[in-house]
Amino acid sequence: METVSPPIVLTSEGVEALIVEPLGNLDGVTHRVLWRDASSMAGVLSVQAGHRLGTHAHRFNHHHMWVVEGCATILGAELGPGSYVHIPSGVYHDIDATTTGGCTVFYLYQSPGG
């Protein structure tokens, strides 16, 4: 019988209370992990003004992003709150806040089969 994980419900205070982790060795880039399993992950990414994530690709996962606040350049488009981006696996991209006041982005890495 398959084990079912319990649902996760977080208020805005609960999200704010999550551990803020640096993303690799990048200055000005942090994230909070909301949920993860063996092949997928959801979280909140913060890129401070004047910083960028750096060009990279996710070899095995689709990347979904929804801009929550602020602005950033993603795939060459200047995106603000409410904007959504889907990046298929293998596509190089960046999250660039070097010319904006920074941004907060909800992200989901999803395995192609999931």
Predicted regions and their residues:
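Solvent-exposed residues in well-ordered beta-strands and their adjoining turns
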Residues: Q48-G50, T73, Q110
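Conserved short histidine dyad/triad with adjacent acidic residue
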Residues: L26-H31, W35-H58, E78, P88-Y92
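A short, N-terminal "cap"/entry segment at the start of jelly-roll beta-barrel domains
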Residues: M1-S39
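Well-ordered beta-strand positions
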Residues: W35, W66, H86, D96-T98
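Ligand-binding loop in jelly-roll beta-barrel domains
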Residues: N61, E78-G80, S89-G114
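Glycine- and acidic-residue-biased ligand/ion/polar-headgroup-sensing regions
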Residues: R59-I74
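Short, well-ordered beta-strand segments in beta-rich or mixed alpha/beta enzyme
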Residues: G43-V47, V68-G70, V105
